[in-house]
Amino acid sequence: LFERSFKIDFVKIIYTGEKLNLMNKLLTLTLGCLLLIPQLVPAAEVNILSERQEFLLRPFLKAFEENTGIKANVVYLKKGSLERLKQQPGAVDALLTVDISNLTAIAEAGLFQPVNSSVINKNVPSNYRDPKGLWSALTARGRVIYYSKDRVKLSELSTYEALADAKFAKRICTRSGYHKYNVALISSMIAEHGVAAAKNWLQGLKNNLARKPQGNDRGQVKAIYQGQCDVAIGNTYYMGKMLERDDQREWAASVGIFFPNQNDRGTHMNVSGGAVTRDAVNKNEAVRLLEFLSGDLAQYMYAQVNHEYPVKEGVSYSGIVSSFGSSQEGVKKGIFKQDKRNLSEIGSYRKKAIQILDEVNYDK
């Protein structure tokens, strides 16, 4: 008889050919047990490039990590995300940024990949998403008219177009026309009226300026407070932030918000948004991030913390934002008519907007 010795864990088994079947069973059982032992695998993660400020984004990412178990690694930039994505393909899975012009420019450069998520499609209205799924808005802000409560009657205000009327001569302040928020507004005028009409409007707006374009949106509120001008153009959420600051509350309290174009297309909206990069290594995790940021919890946090408008319907505005436009007919609890034109179309006119800014020498 064929006979050998085989040792497993100090137990010596003497077996013959008849016992070979038993040995096969033991090996099978051993392999099965090994498969039950947890394997050491890298933790899920997502690498993020953000042009949103760290203090604002940090609580959202903490909530994301706690809810999903995905680690969020972030690099913060003030600007230059297009160049960074070109220089370091594959280093970033998701981009978080502000302004439709930024999102459109990077999409046109081929640095995003399409995402087809039923969660995002449900949470975010179609006008706030790229038609090809290349990016999605996460919050919105209105580009509104700031006005002096003491020197301007509501009956004087109506539309963006009317800001070029002679009655506003030497009464308007703006920041640089080349700032992304103004470029987006001018792009929306081109989308609505065409290049020639938008240029005429921009020339009329320039003619009505009380001073050379300067400062930021908060600076326009301060200028109204100081009497340098009566009317300005700015984003809604800045007013919310100013009302929370002791050193700026008095400025903001003297200025009202008017939502233009309520009787036609609605107020121009801009956004913060997100996208999955073309070379994302952790694509699934990047999609999970955008889904989370478009969901109820993150949308509520955006609204309450930064006084932005949630893009998901049914999420409450902050108390401050709900008070905006309270004196304006047709505006109730801060709810107003928004321009529903797809933002990708508006963003596509950004180069023409810059061209007519050059042609009218807006900042000079």
Regions of interest found by a model, annotated:
Residues L49-R52, P131-K132, Y147-K149, S155, ...:
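Short beta-strand->loop
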Residues S272-K337:
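Mature extracytoplasmic/periplasmic domains
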Residues G90-L95, Q113-I145, E161, R171-T174:
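A structural signal for short loop-to-beta-strand junctions that line the ligand-binding cleft
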Residues K122, N127, R141, L202-K206, ...:
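Periplasmic-binding protein-like
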Residues I100-L111, D130-S158, I186-S187, M269-A275:
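Periplasmic solute-binding protein
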Residues K332-K364:
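Conserved C-terminal helix/tail region of periplasmic/extracytoplasmic solute-binding proteins
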Residues A44-T104:
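Early extracytoplasmic/lumenal segment of secretory-pathway proteins
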Residues S188, H193-P260:
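Ligand-binding pocket segment of bilobal, Venus flytrap-like solute-binding proteins
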